Amino acid sequence: MTQVFGENGELIPVTVVEAKENVVLQKKTVEVDGYNAIQVGFEDKKAYKKDAKSNKYANKPAEGHAKKADAAPKRFIREFRNVDVDAYEVGQEVSVDTFVAGDVIDVTGVSKGKGFQGAIKRHGQSRGPMSHGSHFHRAPGSVGMASDASRVFKGQKMPGRMGGNTVTVQNLEVVQVDTENKVILVKGNVPGPKKGLVEIRTSIKKGNK
């Protein structure tokens, strides 16, 4: 994150989101596919290489799919529904000028992985007394009943893997759009680590496009 100053001198914390090489690979229509959507690819993959075991290399189907759009195979491919399909053409680059300052957007990403964590950190549960003969401190309490249920109910909040989930932060404001460097400055923070992949959509609650 960084910060910029508004017109009135107010300090605004922003996240810099880079948006390069977004190419429309396919258009889907109600007549052919049953719904309207555009398929967008991001970040080039290496060309097909026989017997390549790394996923950095594209396979033959991926190369053929991208060739229809006269583009290189892409590492990330996503679909966006509820858009004006007629406003896009296959092979067209979707640039940052799709958004302008003041737009309200939803940002989706994969949250930071925290590894295996206890119930206190993972679910915000309270710990036990730390002194005076306490037999539990950060351990979880009762997780079920005795003979009546004779099992632990599904969904019980227990220790486990934390983070690494798909998270959407809604109603974030676009502070600035830099078309020269192809970056968007978003007010506040977005899900995921640095250099993580995020999807930016028009706000579903406060849509403006």
UniProtKB/Swiss-Prot annotation:
One of its GO terms (molecular function) is rRNA binding. Gene3D superfamilies: 3.30.160.810, Translation factors. It comes from the Bacteria. Signal peptide: none annotated. Coiled coil: none annotated. GO terms for cellular component: cytosolic large ribosomal subunit. Residues 119-145 are annotated as: Disordered. One of its GO terms (biological process) is translation. Keywords: Ribonucleoprotein, Ribosomal protein, RNA-binding, rRNA-binding. Belongs to the universal ribosomal protein uL3 family. One of the primary rRNA binding proteins, it binds directly near the 3'-end of the 23S rRNA, where it nucleates assembly of the 50S subunit. Part of the 50S ribosomal subunit. Forms a cluster with proteins L14 and L19. This is Large ribosomal subunit protein uL3.
